[in-house]
C-alpha cells in the first residue's frame, strides 16, 4: 500500500460538548416534570352486556394522585374479590370453642425451642466412655416357633406367644465376653441391622426377640460408667422397632381409595390393623421380665392411637407405675427418661404423666445414697463423684420435659420439693440445667443459698455454680443482687485447685462479669485467670476455654480504647503460646475492631496494641501458608490501616505508613493498600493547600511520592506494579512533581516488556494482552497532559512507549497491537490541537509549552505516519481466507478513527478512508446494519458547519448488496 500522510482535524471541544447536550425546554408552571407525581385519570364506561349476562358498571370519572404502577389495575385484586364473595360466617369472630381448640393445638406440638434428644445423644456418647471390658448376649437367630398359621382358639394364641418368647430364653443366645467399647458398639449395631433384616424378611417374632434381648441389657450395670452410652445405643434399636411396627400397622390402613390422614381417629382404622396392633401388645404383655416388657411396650406407645383415643393417656400412668418395680436407681431414672422421651413425642399435651415421673423420682432419690448403691460402687471401685454425674443426662431430660412451657407455680413447687431433700446437689444441677433461664436468674440468691447448703462430697459445688452461670449468661438477675452473686460465685471458683475445673467455671462467669460490670471487675477476673493458668503452663490444655473468654470480652467491649486500657488484657493474650491458636485469637480481635470501630482513631493505646496484634498475624505467614489465609490476614490488616487517621498531622500519618511498611512487608495486598493510602495523603495535602504548595508541603508530597516509588518494585504482581506506577505518576503530576512523575512513567514503560503472555487469575491462566491493552489505553490518556522534559526530545515518553510496543512479542492471532496503535493515533491527534481536552491545574502541558509550534506538529505528524504505516501493513497481512473477518473489522475500526480524528479535506486521507470502506465490505464480511448506521452518521455530520466535505465522501461510500 502507498504511504498516506496524516492530517488531524482541528477540534473545538467546547462546541462539540455543547452540541452533544440535550436541548433544554423551558417549563411553564404546571407542565410535566419527571419528578412530579403521576396523575392518572381513570374513566369507567358502561359495559355492553352480553347475552346471558346481567352485569354492568356505572360510568364515572375520577382523578387522583396514585402510584404509577397501580394504574394497570382496574379494581380489586383477585384474592380480595374472592374473600369478599366468601361466606360471611367464615369471616366472623373466633368463637370460644375455636379458641380453646387453638390453645389445645399449641400444647399438642413441641416447638423449636425444645432441645431435641438427638443433640444430647451425641454429647452422651462422647462423654460417657470406658476402658473396661464389656459383655453382651448375642441372639443366634433360631427359627423354631416362627409364626406361620394362626391358632384357632385364644388359649392356643397365648400358648404360641409364650413358646415363641421362651425359645429365646432356652439357648438361642451366646454370651460374648471381654469386649472393648468399640467392639460392644459394633455388636449393638449388628443387632440393629439384624432387626431390620428380620423385619424385611417378614420374621416379626425374630425382630421382637432381638428387641427383648437388647432391652435386657439395660438391667446390667456391671460397667456402670458406660451405662448412659449403653442406654443411648439400645434405645436407638427400640426407636427403630417402634417405628417399624407403627409403619406396618399404618400401611394396613391404606386401601386403594385413600390413605390414613395425619390426624386420624380410631374410627379410620380397619379391623385387620386393629387386630394386628392388639396382637403386638399381647405379645409384649407376655414378656416375663419387667425391664424388657416396659421398654418394648414404651417403644410402641404411639400404636395406641390405632386402638382408642384414650389409649396413650391410659397407658402412660401404668408405665410410670411399672418403673416403681425397678430397684436400681440408675436403671430406674433412665427408664423414666425413656418414657418421658416417648411421651413428649407422641403426647406432649399429657403433662400429668411427665409430672408424675418427676415426683416419683424424688420419692426414690434417697436410694442413691443407700447401702445397696454404696456397696455396688465399692465393688466396682467407683467414687461417688464419678457416679453421680451418670444421672445427669436422664435427670436433665426429665426436668426439661417437665419444665417445658410449665406454669410458674409448677416450677416453684418442683424447686421447693428439691430443696427439702438432703444431699440434693445433683437435683439442683438438673433444675438449673433444665428450667428456664429467666426463672433461675430471678431466684439467683435462692439458688446460691441452696448451693451453699449442699454437701461437697456428693457433687462438686463448682459444677453447680457453672450451671448457675450458664443461666445468668442468658437472663439478667435483679440489679441489686448482681455484685453479691459474682462475689459468692468467685469465692468458690478461685479456690479450685484443678486448672481444668477452674477454667471451665471461669469461662462461664466471664460472660456474666462483662454483661453487668465495668473494666475494673473484668480486669480482676482476667488477672485471676492468669494467676491460675500460668503455673505449670496449664493454659496449654485449655486453649478453647481461653479463646472463649477472649471472644466474650470483645463481644461486650466495643470501645477499644476501654478494652486496651484493661491492664491484664494483653498479658492474657500472652498465654496463647501455640501459634495457630494465637493467630486465630488475633483474627477474632481484628474482626471485632473492623466491625465495631465507627470513627478513625489515633489513640496511641489502640494503635500500639493493634500493631502488635497485626504484627503477630503477619509473622505467622510462611511458605506453607495458603493463599486464602494470606488474603484473610491482609484484609484484616488493611481494615486496621484504613481506620487510622491523625487528622491534619500528615507527617505523623506518613510516619505510621512507613512503620507499617516495615512491619507488613510479606503481605502484598497490605503494601498495595499502603501505597494507595500514601497517594491519598498527598492528594489531601494538595486539597488543604488548594494546589498552592508551600516549601514544606512540597517537600512533604515529594516524600510521599518517594515512598511509593520505593515500595512499588517490591510487589510481585506485574499489572499491580504497572497500575500503581501510573496512579502514583498521576498523583505526582497533580502535585507539580514533574521529574518524579516522569520517573514513574519511565518505570512503567520499562516494565511493559516483562509482561508475560499469560497471568494467573483465581487459579486459572488467562491471556495477558487484554489487560495490557486496558493499561496502555489508560496510560495514553495520562500522556496527553504530561509535558515534555526540556532535556529530552519532543514526545520522548510516547516514542519510548512506541518502541516498547513495537518490540513486544504479540500473539499472531491477536489484533491488540493494532488496537493499541489506533489508540496512539487518537493520542497524537489530541496532542496536535491548539488547546487540549483537559489539563492538570498548575501544570503546563505541551499545548502551552509549544503553542502550536510547527516543529512540534511536524514531529507529531511523522509519528502519526509511522503508526499508520504499521496499521496498514497489518491489514495487508490479513488478506487470507481465515483472517478476512478480522481484516473487515479492523478496516472499519480504522475508518471510524480517521472519521473521528482525521481531516478528510485532505485528498489522500479522504481516499484512504474510501479504500478502507471498500476493504471492510470486500469479502462480504461486514455487518450491513453497522455500515448503514455509519453512513447515516456521516450524512448527519455533513450538515454541521465546516463539514460539507463529508457530503462528497458519503457519495463515494457505496453499501454492499446481498446477491
From Swiss-Prot:
Keywords per UniProt: Endosome, Membrane, Phosphoprotein, Protein transport, Transmembrane, Transmembrane helix, Transport
Membrane protein topology class: Single-pass membrane protein
Domain of life of the organism encoding this protein: Eukaryota
Main location per the UniProt record: membrane
Transmembrane segments: 699-719
BP GO terms, sorted: endocytic recycling; Golgi to plasma membrane transport; protein transport
This protein's record includes keyword Transmembrane: yes
Phosphoserine: residues carrying this PTM: 265
Sequence segments annotated as region (Disordered): 43-112
UniProt feature, compositional bias: Low complexity: 51-72
Compartments, as annotated in UniProt: Membrane; Endosome
Disruption phenotype: Homozygous VPS35L knockout is embryonic lethal at an early stage of embryo development, between 7.5 and 10.5 dpc.
Gene Ontology CC terms: endosome; membrane
InterPro entries: VPS35L (IPR029705)
Quaternary structure note: Component of the heterotrimeric retriever complex formed by VPS26C, VPS29 and VPS35L. Interacts with VPS29. Interacts with COMMD1, CCDC93 and CCDC22; associates with the CCC (COMMD/CCDC22/CCDC93) complex which contains at least COMMD1 (and possibly other COMM domain-containing proteins), CCDC22 and CCDC93. Interacts with WASHC1, WASHC2A and WASHC2C. Interacts with SNX17 and SNX31.
Job of this protein: Acts as a component of the retriever complex. The retriever complex is a heterotrimeric complex related to retromer cargo-selective complex (CSC) and essential for retromer-independent retrieval and recycling of numerous cargos such as integrin alpha-5/beta-1 (ITGA5:ITGB1). The recruitment of the retriever complex to the endosomal membrane involves CCC and WASH complexes.
Family of the protein in this entry: Belongs to the VPS35L family.
Name the record gives this protein: VPS35 endosomal protein-sorting factor-like
Lineage: Eukaryota, Metazoa, Chordata, Craniata, Vertebrata
Amino acid at each position: 500500500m502507498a504511504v498516506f500522510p496524516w492530517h488531524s482535524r482541528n477540534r473545538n471541544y467546547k462546541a462539540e460538548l455543547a452540541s452533544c447536550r440535550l436541548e433544554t425546554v423551558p417549563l411553564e408552571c404546571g407542565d410535566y416534570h419527571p419528578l412530579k407525581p403521576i396523575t392518572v385519570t381513570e374513566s369507567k364506561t358502561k359495559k355492553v352486556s352480553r347475552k346471558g349476562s346481567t352485569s354492568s358498571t356505572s360510568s364515572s370519572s375520577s382523578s387522583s394522585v396514585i402510584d404509577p404502577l397501580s394504574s394497570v389495575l382496574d379494581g380489586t385484586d383477585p384474592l380480595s374479590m374472592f374473600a369478599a364473595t366468601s361466606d360471611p360466617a367464615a369471616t366472623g369472630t373466633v368463637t370460644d370453642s375455636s379458641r380453646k381448640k387453638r390453645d389445645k393445638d399449641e400444647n399438642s406440638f413441641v416447638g423449636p425451642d425444645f432441645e431435641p434428644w438427638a443433640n444430647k445423644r451425641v454429647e452422651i456418647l462422647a462423654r460417657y466412655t470406658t476402658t473396661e471390658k464389656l459383655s453382651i448376649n448375642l441372639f443366634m437367630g433360631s427359627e423354631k416357633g416362627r409364626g406361620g398359621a394362626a391358632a384357632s382358639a385364644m388359649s392356643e394364641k397365648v400358648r404360641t406367644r409364650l413358646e415363641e418368647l421362651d425359645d429365646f430364653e432356652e439357648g438361642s443366645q451366646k454370651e460374648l465376653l471381654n469386649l472393648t467399647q468399640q467392639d460392644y458398639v459394633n455388636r449393638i449395631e449388628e443387632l440393629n441391622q439384624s432387626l431390620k433384616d428380620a423385619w424385611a424378611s417378614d420374621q416379626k417374632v425374630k425382630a421382637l426377640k432381638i428387641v427383648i434381648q437388647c432391652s435386657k441389657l439395660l438391667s446390667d450395670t456391671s460397667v456402670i460408667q458406660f451405662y448412659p452410652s449403653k442406654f443411648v445405643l439400645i434405645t436407638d434399636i427400640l426407636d427403630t422397632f417402634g417405628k417399624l411396627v407403627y409403619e406396618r400397622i399404618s400401611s394396613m390402613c391404606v386401601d386403594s381409595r385413600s390413605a390414613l390422614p395425619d390426624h386420624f381417629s380410631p374410627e379410620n382404622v380397619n379391623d385387620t390393623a386393629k387386630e394386628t396392633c392388639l396382637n403386638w401388645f399381647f405379645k409384649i404383655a407376655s414378656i416375663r421380665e419387667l425391664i424388657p416388657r416396659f421398654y418394648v411396650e414404651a417403644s410402641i406407645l404411639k400404636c395406641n392411637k390405632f386402638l382408642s383415643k384414650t389409649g396413650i393417656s391410659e397407658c402412660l400412668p401404668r408405665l410410670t407405675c411399672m418403673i416403681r418395680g425397678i430397684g436400681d436407681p440408675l436403671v430406674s431414672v433412665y427408664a423414666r427418661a425413656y418414657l418421658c422421651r416417648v411421651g413428649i413425642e407422641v403426647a406432649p399435651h399429657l403433662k400429668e404423666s411427665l409430672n408424675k415421673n418427676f415426683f416419683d423420682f424424688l420419692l426414690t432419690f434417697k436410694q442413691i445414697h443407700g447401702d445397696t448403691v454404696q456397696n455396688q460402687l465399692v465393688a466396682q471401685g467407683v467414687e461417688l463423684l464419678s457416679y453421680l454425674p451418670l444421672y445427669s443426662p436422664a435427670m436433665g431430660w426429665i426436668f426439661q420435659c417437665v419444665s417445658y412451657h410449665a406454669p410458674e407455680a409448677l416450677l416453684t413447687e418442683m424447686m421447693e420439693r428439691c430443696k427439702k431433700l438432703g444431699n440434693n446437689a445433683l437435683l439442683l444441677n438438673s433444675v438449673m440445667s433444665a428450667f428456664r433461664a429467666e426463672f433461675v436468674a430471678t431466684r439467683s440468691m435462692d439458688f446460691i443459698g441452696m448451693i451453699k447448703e449442699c454437701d461437697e462430697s456428693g457433687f462438686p459445688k463448682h459444677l453447680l455454680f457453672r450451671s448457675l452461670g450458664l443461666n445468668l449468661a442468658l437472663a439478667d438477675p435483679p440489679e441489686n443482687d448482681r455484685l453479691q452473686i459474682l462475689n459468692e460465685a468467685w469465692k468458690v471458683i478461685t479456690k479450685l485447685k484443678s486448672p481444668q475445673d477452674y477454667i471451665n467455671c471461669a469461662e462461664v462467669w466471664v460472660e456474666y462479669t462483662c454483661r453487668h460490670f465495668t473494666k475494673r471487675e473484668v480486669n480482676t477476673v482476667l488477672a485471676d485467670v492468669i494467676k491460675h493458668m500460668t503455673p505449670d503452663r496449664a493454659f496449654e490444655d485449655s486453649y478453647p476455654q481461653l479463646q472463649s473468654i477472649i471472644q466474650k470480652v470483645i463481644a461486650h467491649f466495643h470501645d477499644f480504647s476501654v478494652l486496651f486500657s484493661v491492664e491484664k488484657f494483653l498479658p492474657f493474650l500472652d498465654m496463647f503460646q501455640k501459634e495457630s491458636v494465637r493467630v486465630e485469637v488475633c483474627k477474632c480481635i481484628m474482626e471485632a475492631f473492623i466491625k465495631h470501630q465507627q470513627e478513625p482513631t489515633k489513640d496511641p493505646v489502640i494503635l500500639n496494641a493493634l500493631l502488635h496484634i497485626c504484627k503477630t498475624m503477619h509473622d505467622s505467614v510462611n511458605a506453607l501458608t495458603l493463599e486464602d489465609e494470606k488474603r484473610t490476614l491482609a484484609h484484616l490488616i488493611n481494615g486496621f490501616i484504613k481506620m487510622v487517621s491523625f487528622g491534619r498531622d500528615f507527617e505523623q500519618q506518613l510516619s505510621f505508613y512507613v512503620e507499617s511498611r516495615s512491619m507488613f512487608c510479606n503481605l502484598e495486598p497490605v503494601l498495595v493498600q499502603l501505597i494507595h493510602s500514601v497517594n491519598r495523603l498527598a492528594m489531601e495535602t494538595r486539597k488543604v493547600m488548594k494546589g498552592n504548595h508551600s516549601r514544606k508541603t512540597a517537600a512533604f508530597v515529594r516524600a510521599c511520592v518517594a515512598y511509593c516509588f520505593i515500595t512499588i518494585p517490591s510487589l510481585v504482581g506485574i499489572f499491580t506494579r504497572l497500575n500503581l506506577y501510573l496512579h502514583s505518576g498521576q498523583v505526582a503530576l497533580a502535585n507539580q512533581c514533574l521529574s518524579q512523575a516522569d520517573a514513574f512513567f519511565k518505570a512503567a514503560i520499562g516494565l511493559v516488556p516483562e509482561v508475560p503472555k499469560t497471568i494467573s487469575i483465581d487459579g486459572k491462566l488467562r491471556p495477558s494482552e487484554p489487560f495490557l491493552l486496558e493499561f496502555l489505553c489508560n496510560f495514553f490518556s495520562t500522556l496527553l497532559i504530561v509535558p515534555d522534559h526540556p532535556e529530552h526530545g519532543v514526545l520522548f515518553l510516547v516514542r519510548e512507549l512506541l518502541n516498547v510496543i513495537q518490540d513486544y512479542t504479540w500473539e499472531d492471532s491477536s489484533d491488540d497491537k493494532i488496537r493499541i496503535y489506533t489508540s496512539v493515533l487518537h493520542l497524537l491527534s489530541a496532542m496536535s490541537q491548539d488547546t487540549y481536552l483537559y489539563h492538570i491545574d498548575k501544570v503546563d502541558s505541551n499545548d502551552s509549552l509549544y503553542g502550536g509550534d510547527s516543529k512540534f506538529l511536524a514531529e507529531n505528524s511523522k509519528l502519526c505516519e509511522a503508526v499508520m504505516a504499521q496499521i496498514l501493513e497489518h491489514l495487508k497481512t490479513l488478506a487470507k481466507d481465515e483472517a478476512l473477518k478480522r481484516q473487515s473489522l479492523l478496516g472499519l475500526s480504522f475508518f471510524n478513527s480517521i472519521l473521528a480524528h482525521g481531516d478528510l479535506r485532505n485528498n489522500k486521507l479522504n481516499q484512504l478512508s474510501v479504500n478502507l470502506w471498500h476493504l471492510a465490505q470486500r469479502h462480504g464480511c461486514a455487518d450491513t446494519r453497522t455500515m448503514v448506521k455509519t453512513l447515516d452518521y456521516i450524512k448527519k455530520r455533513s450538515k454541521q458547519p465546516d463539514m460539507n466535505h463529508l457530503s462528497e465522501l458519503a457519495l463515494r461510500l457505496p453499501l454492499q448488496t446481498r446477491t
